[in-house]
Regions:
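Glycine-rich beta-strand-centered segment in the early N-terminal region that forms part
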Residues: 30-47, 55-99
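NAD(P)H dinucleotide-binding glycine-rich loop of Rossmann-like/cofactor-binding domains
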Residues: 72-79, 86, 91-159
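Generic hydrophobic/aromatic pocket-lining and core-packing "Φ" positions
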Residues: 143, 168-169, 189, 234, ...
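Short amphipathic alpha-helix with an adjacent loop that forms part of the alpha/beta core around
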Residues: 208-219
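C-terminal hydrophobic helical "lid"/dimerization subdomain
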Residues: 3, 287-346
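Mid-domain Rossmann-like dinucleotide-binding core that forms the NAD(H)/NADP(H) cofactor-binding site
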Residues: 129-207
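Glycine-rich phosphate-binding loop and adjacent beta-alpha segment
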Residues: 232-302, 337-346
Length: 346
């Protein structure tokens, strides 16, 4: 009997905030497994804001575009069901996988697939989709590798209650920095103060008052801006940057729904005047060099890392579209209904 899988595709390019009708679930046949490839059973998928940029017609060129009819992909956790390559059946892997169901997903055996080797103190599989996965790697790469906060420095983290931002806050804390965080709701700001211990929280949905609030929270300026939001928040951060300060540019979420290419803040030239440094970065390509060090450091962090788990492949559009409502805290993932030793707890 022919083998098939279910896979989410882009039905049309979203206009503004995506809705469920922008995606379509299709059954796809799977050909016989070629030599050198593995057949994967997907157990969990990461849901991330950057995916919105892949649906835009231009800009954001570091990842392939998704046009109408294109199958979607995400960072995922999977088990090797069959192998005609160097990896063993039954092994667990993480990597960029099709947004497809748990039955049979065939992918090549590239270096982008990483073996599952969670530290013994962190045995839960959902952790590979959050702090031990691409989300944690993004926060670690931006904050620890590029930002390098020092004891006593003042660090601003925007979108700080999200998956990447909340981990970036904790990495800055671990380095001994004084952390100011922005978030878009009172509940998020309370969580950041009470659970993550930031010294001040700012409302990033109040562009008129943000600059004044930041000046009150950091009267002597900030040394490092971990920027994920853009817009008025980014502009205000540049204005408060101290001489020789740094900006680590992780993302510009406020512009992700805009079909036009991303725009720089009007005061970007101030960086030159103060001897500041702007470090934009993307994750692809960093894994081979830094993955092992990242895993070792994250194992010792034991972060506060809430998971928002939705169940079933059918929930993927709802999970993705819900990212942009501004209500979630922590990391959103989709767990597929595979039965295994890793299924009991997440």
């Amino acid at each position: 009997m022919p083998v098939s899988t279910l896979c989410w595709h882009l039905a049309r390019r979203p206009e503004g905030i995506p809705g469920p009708s922008d995606f379509v679930l299709r059954e796809m046949p799977l050909p016989p497994l070629p030599r050198g490839q593995v057949e994967l059973e997907v157990h969990g998928l990461s849901v991330d804001p950057y995916m919105r940029t892949r649906m835009q017609p231009q800009g954001y060129g570091y990842l392939a575009k998704w046009g109408p009819g294109t199958p979607l992909s995400a960072w995922g956790l999977a088990r090797i069901r069959r192998s005609r390559g160097r990896w063993r059946e039954g092994d667990w892997v993480v990597g960029h996988l099709p947004v497809a169901n748990r039955v049979h997903v065939r992918v090549p055996e590239p270096d982008a697939l990483l073996p599952l080797c969670l530290p013994a103190a962190t045995p839960l599989p959902g952790r590979w989709l959050h702090e031990h996965g691409m989300t944690g790697f993004t926060a670690w790469l931006g904050m620890r590798h590029y930002g390098r906060p020092q004891p006593g420095e003042t660090v601003l983290v925007s979108a700080a209650a999200g998956a990447v931002g909340s981990l970036a806050v904790q990495l800055a804390h671990r380095a001994g920095a004084r952390v100011i965080a922005s978030a878009g709701s009172a509940a998020k700001r309370t969580w950041l103060r009470e659970r993550l211990g930031v010294v001040a929280t700012l409302d990033d949905r109040d562009p008129e008052g943000f600059a004044e609030a930041l000046a009150e929270a950091a009267p002597e300026g900030i040394d490092l801006d971990f920027e994920s939001l853009g817009g008025a928040v980014f502009e205000a951060a540049i204005e408060r940057l101290r001489p020789c300060g740094r900006v680590v540019l992780c993302g510009l979420i406020s512009q992700y729904h805009d079909p036009e290419p991303r725009r720089a803040p009007p005061n970007l030239a101030r960086l030159q005047a103060i001897g500041g440094r702007l470090v934009p970065f993307v994750v692809p390509g960093h894994e081979p060099e830094h993955w092992a060090r990242f895993q070792a450091e994250m194992a010792g962090l034991d972060p506060v890392a809430p998971l928002d788990v939705l169940h079933g492949l059918e929930a993927w559009p709802r999970a993705f579209c819900g990212l942009f409502t501004g209500k979630g805290i922590g990391k959103r993932v989709v767990r597929l209904g595979c039965q295994s030793a890793l299924s009991a707890a997440w």
